[in-house]
Swiss-Prot record:
It is not known whether 1 or 2 smaller activation peptides, with additional cleavage after Arg-314, are released in natural blood clotting. This is Prothrombin. Thrombin, which cleaves bonds after Arg and Lys, converts fibrinogen to fibrin and activates factors V, VII, VIII, XIII, and, in complex with thrombomodulin, protein C. Functions in blood homeostasis, inflammation and wound healing. Activates coagulation factor XI (F11); activation is promoted by the contact with negatively charged surfaces. Triggers the production of pro-inflammatory cytokines, such as MCP-1/CCL2 and IL8/CXCL8, in endothelial cells. It comes from Homo sapiens (Human). The keyword Phosphoprotein does not apply. Residues 551-573 are annotated as: High affinity receptor-binding region which is also known as the TP508 peptide. The active site is at H406, D462, S568.
């Protein structure tokens, strides 16, 4: 500015002070007089402006200002940092004044566009931007912690790293990590980059077009589709190979197995399928648009009075029917879900009553330490080199482990692990300590990822099986969980009923290194209520399918809890009041942040995919 900043005496004030000094008998001024002389005085543009707080428009818009002058006007370090980032970006636009004002407002881009603070959230090709706070589908290396002054709000386009292409964002398309946005240029009739919409079919399909759907998972389908989703031709049902494979299968005789057309004779929740040429037992699913039918809507409205009595301790017996072939599945199913240190000793753990009572009343953040032996089916998926915890998983027999597909394969995070990259640690309680004589370390023989796992869009069918090289011995700390049948899924998967999530994931959402209080020392447990499907769908822009459900507390419920990074792949379990067994209803899949208001954790619906589990185990279990 034109004048010198510092201590100044305006004309009349200086004259008065001089007169006081001349006529005074004292050399030094009284404290009150001294303070009045040393008070900083601003140049007046209007009458009495000396006594106002700093005026940002006068200081920095009408004339050039320094950081200190901006701070004096704003009186806040945070506000000054945000303003200064925009101001330095707009400095080249000092004239005309209206251009600088527009630049500071942030609704247009100046230079590299680091000043932009508008609400555009679509990239130049029409892809919706990913939330800056989210790690899905991409893990951002730039966030509000690394760039606190960049105003990384919601999913608005910004330029925190001074990219030469202007404001940009991470995208919701897993195949496109980041892309620039088309932003108006300050003072010009143009944009930073031109819009170039992608051709149809290449963008993320957040709202697929409606078309006639096939009901009942295709069990009544009579069409002529005869090719799998991978383009393989179906074998004729009357062929020798297909007949041999179906000989011991429990097929519905009402389903007509005509020629080589895709059919659903075994009630597979995945829909129609067929055998294909290749290894004995090879099969493939066929691509149809199925009507969404929630399991809980198909067979009932939850538990009845009998279950209330069971919860109250009067009756709790129900014969357990095994589902898998022990020759391929291994041992453990007949005894599944009955924990050696609890049910087998007629003991309850400290929080299971909360789950059972919820059936009557209708990443673990805010969780607590699990009791030893509380979750004996919990498995730690461990990377060999560098050694690190990758995910959770669950033991379903002495040979098979269940986890989320994205723990093994997720290209946006450079994940594509093989059996040689990983091992599993079973029976653990401590996150880091080797628990001698308690935990078992097992190598993997083979990984099987669901063939229709959709990492490109929404993690649909986020499920994988891992076969152990050698069967693991059961103990007080190692025991398999049950997988639900239709009746169990229909009765327990009700909105408001609580399930349990366990894991060694982060205790809170953080962008900093996972050290100290950010990670637990022992296995964590949290009980979470299942949420109504419409609420789940309304909580996110991501397309939700009937292979998913969500759980968590609503903002007005007064309780908190969620799975967090590191809990992925772990089990969501519920205890049946009918037979006192624990069932794995879900697999920790994805969420937008950890324990955020209005956001919920999403889980793979295990029962929906149980027939796929059976087919894989029957084919590769020997």
């Amino acid at each position: 500015m034109a004048h010198v900043r510092g201590l100044q005496l305006p004309g009349c004030l200086a004259l008065a002070a001089l007169c006081s000094l001349v006529h005074s008998q004292h050399v030094f001024l009284a404290p009150q007089q001294a303070r009045s002389l040393l008070q900083r005085v601003r140049r007046a543009n209007t009458f009495l402006e000396e006594v106002r707080k700093g005026n940002l428009e006068r200081e920095c818009v009408e004339e050039t200002c320094s950081y200190e002058e901006a701070f004096e006007a704003l009186e806040s370090s945070t506000a000054t940092d945000v303003f200064w980032a925009k101001y330095t970006a707009c400095e080249t636009a000092r004239t005309p004044r209206d251009k600088l004002a527009a630049c500071l407002e942030g609704n247009c881009a100046e230079g590299l566009g680091t000043n932009y603070r508008g609400h555009v959230n679509i990239t130049r090709s029409g892809i919706e931007c990913q939330l800056w706070r989210s790690r899905y589908p991409h893990k951002p290396e730039i966030n509000s912690t690394t760039h606190p002054g960049a105003d990384l709000q919601e999913n608005f386009c910004r330029n925190p790293d001074s990219s030469t292409t202007g404001p940009w964002c991470y995208t919701t398309d897993p195949t496109v990590r980041r892309q620039e946005c088309s932003i108006p240029v300050c003072g010009q009739d143009q944009v930073t980059v031109a819009m170039t919409p992608r051709s149809e079919g290449s963008s993320v399909n957040l709202s697929p077009p409606l078309e006639q759907c096939v009901p009942d998972r295709g069990q009544q389908y009579q069409g002529r589709l005869a090719v799998t989703t991978h383009g393989l031709p179906c074998l004729a049902w009357a062929s020798a190979q297909a007949k041999a494979l179906s000989k011991h299968q429990d097929f519905n005789s009402a389903v007509q197995l005509v020629e080589n057309f895709c059919r659903n004779p075994d009630g597979d929740e995945e829909g129609v399928w067929c055998y294909v040429a290749g290894k004995p037992g090879d099969f493939g699913y066929c691509d149809l648009n199925y009507c969404e039918e929630a399991v809980e809507e198909e067979t009932g409205d939850g538990l009845d009075e009998d279950s209330d009595r069971a919860i109250e301790g009067r009756t709790a017996t129900s014969e357990y029917q095994t589902f898998f072939n022990p020759r391929t599945f291994g041992s453990g199913e007949a005894d599944c879900g009955l924990r050696p240190l609890f049910e087998k000793k007629s003991l309850e753990d400290k929080t299971e009553r909360e789950l059972l009572e919820s059936y009557i009343d209708g990443r673990i953040v805010e969780g607590s330490d699990a009791e030893i032996g509380m979750s004996p089916w919990q498995v730690m998926l461990f990377r060999k080199s560098p050694q690190e915890l990758l995910c959770g998983a669950s033991l379903i027999s002495d040979r098979w482990v269940l986890t989320a597909a994205h723990c093994l394969l997720y290209p946006p995070w450079d994940k594509n692990f093989t059996e040689n990259d990983l091992l599993v640690r079973i029976g653990k309680h401590s996150r880091t300590r080797y628990e001698r004589n308690i935990e078992k370390i097992s190598m993997l023989e083979k990984i099987y990822i669901h063939p229709r796992y959709n990492w490109r869009e929404n993690l649909d069918r986020d499920i994988a099986l891992m076969k152990l090289k050698k069967p693991v011995a059961f103990s007080d700390y190692i025991h398999p969980v049950c997988l639900p049948d239709r009746e169990t899924a229909a009765s327990l998967l009700q909105a408001g009923y609580k399930g349990r999530v366990t894991g060694w994931g982060n205790l809170k959402e953080t962008w900093t290194a996972n050290v100290g209080k950010g990670q637990p020392s022992v296995l964590q447990v949290v009980n979470l209520p299942i949420v109504e499907r419409p609420v789940c769908k309304d909580s996110t822009r991501i397309r939700i399918t009937d292979n998913m459900f969500c759980a968590g507390y609503k903002p007005d419920e007064g309780k908190r809890g969620d799975a967090c990074e590191g809990d992925s792949g772990g089990p969501f379990v519920m205890k049946s009041p009918f037979n006192n067994r624990w069932y794995q209803m879900g697999i920790v899949s994805w969420g937008e942040g950890c324990d955020r208001d209005g956001k919920y954790g999403f889980y793979t619906h295990v029962f929906r995919l149980k027939k796929w589990i059976q087919k894989v185990i029957d084919q590769f279990g020997e």
